[in-house]
Amino acid sequence: MISLFDMFKVGIGPSSSHTVGPMKAGKQFVDDLVEKGLLDSVTRVAVDVYGSLSLTGKGHHTDIAIIMGLAGNEPATVDIDSIPGFIRDVEERERLLLAQGRHEVDFPRDNGMRFHNGNLPLHENGMQIHAYNGDEVVYSKTYYSIGGGFIVDEEHFGQDAANEVSVPYPFKSATELLAYCNETGYSLSGLAMQNELALHSKKEIDEYFAHVWQTMQACIDRGMNTEGVLPGPLRVPRRASALRRMLVSSDKLSNDPMNVIDWVNMFALAVNEENAAGGRVVTAPTNGACGIVPAVLAYYDHFIESVSPDIYTRYFMAAGAIGALYKMNASISGAEVGCQGEVGVACSMAAAGLAELLGGSPEQVCVAAEIGMEHNLGLTCDPVAGQVQVPCIERNAIASVKAINAARMALRRTSAPRVSLDKVIETMYETGKDMNAKYRETSRGGLAIKVQCD
């Protein structure tokens, strides 16, 4: 059973699959070298990056992430401000300090990081890391970054975790989830909490989700108070700060009944602009879609009631349980199923979480989740210039408003839905697999080839 800790991971931008996952892979590789007693024998390290990781890797900072992982850093704790200087030193000296400075190796500028357009056999986001002693390979590993910051090595691809802990309500589908809720009388968030308590203590759960919400709030605060231009060739100006000033200073806006939409847009823009700048964010379930879940909870906090620990925990439990269904039965990787697996899933999760907070039954929560995905089916992932900026930032704002609408529609529905959550998850996955690779995070089609950099 997937822990909801894994659905909401603190990390750095701009991408969970192309930044967070590769950093974790680099860290895992160097940890293996230490554990196997090989670190001191290594004289050179080289990396091969494939598929979507290669095609959009520069714009997504994949190369930087792998280097920082090999240096011994983790996404949740890496010192973001230190990254540019560290990378500059590696490039200038063509040397890389591994495992928090324990051992230095060659990392040539020309072939230390090699980008390949083709895919490895098991997934669109593949990478290989090699450690050499002279010309001899002393250790090599193939990793796949499968979305949302999850990584798996080649040997364990498609396998269940060997140390998987049993939970009291091991649902694999929305149908099973609802059956457990009906049988026990638990709300959807309550049932998810019972499973989580089999994996973590109550204290660990409380502390973890307090940190998640604090990180989201800090990200919103930074984003709506920071001006300037986002990094990269597109020179995209930040918009959240100007929108915030407009909202707090205009009497005309304050009397507009649609004013709340502007606030929701601002919350989402703030988060995704921080993500695009490589800031500290929370996967929800990915970085490319990290603005939707916090924007909807910030909406609840500002316009319905102040968010308490009980409220944000219920929200994350319901949203996370829905996200886990997509992770188990479909994909949350834009490189595998397009943006419907990122923004679509985040919209579905946020709609479910909000429906839970608004008093929805488990059935209504699942209807909200279904609506949130149904109207994102077929959504392509075509980042312009390989950056997580256009259309990604604005798309998060649109989907945040859509999630609120989905929750409200679900709660006010008086007839039985014709489309189930399980069927929409199945449809999303099949649609993604049928989607031309041009539209799955390769920047080879759609807006990515129509919008030119200046």
Curated annotation (Swiss-Prot):
Q: In which pathway does it act?
A: Carbohydrate biosynthesis; gluconeogenesis
The record's Gene Ontology cellular component field reads: cytosol
MF terms per GO, please? 4 iron, 4 sulfur cluster binding; L-serine ammonia-lyase activity; metal ion binding
Q: Which Pfam families match?
A: SDH_alpha, SDH_beta
Xref: Gene3D superfamilies: D-3-phosphoglycerate dehydrogenase, domain 3
Its UniProt entry gives the catalysed reaction(s) as: L-serine = pyruvate + NH4(+)
Q: Which domain of life is it from?
A: Bacteria
Give the record's keywords alphabetically: 4Fe-4S, Gluconeogenesis, Iron, Iron-sulfur, Lyase, Metal-binding
* Gene induction: It is made aerobically and anaerobically, in minimal medium.
Q: Return one Gene Ontology term, BP aspect.
A: L-serine catabolic process
Q: Does the keyword 4Fe-4S apply?
A: yes
Under which EC number(s) is this enzyme classified?
A: 4.3.1.17
Modification after translation: Activated by post-translational modification by a system involving at least three gene products. Activation is mimicked in vitro by iron and dithiothreitol. There is considerable evidence for a free-radical activation mechanism.
Instruction: Write down how the cofactor binds this protein.
Output: Binds 1 [4Fe-4S] cluster.
Please tell me whether the keyword Iron is annotated for this protein: yes
| Cofactor (UniProt) | [4Fe-4S] cluster
Q: What does this protein do?
A: Also deaminates threonine, particularly when it is present in high concentration.
List the PANTHER family. L-SERINE DEHYDRATASE, L-SERINE DEHYDRATASE 1
Q: Which family does it belong to?
A: Belongs to the iron-sulfur dependent L-serine dehydratase family.
What is the name attached to this protein's record?
A: L-serine dehydratase 1
Organism source for this protein? Escherichia coli (strain K12)
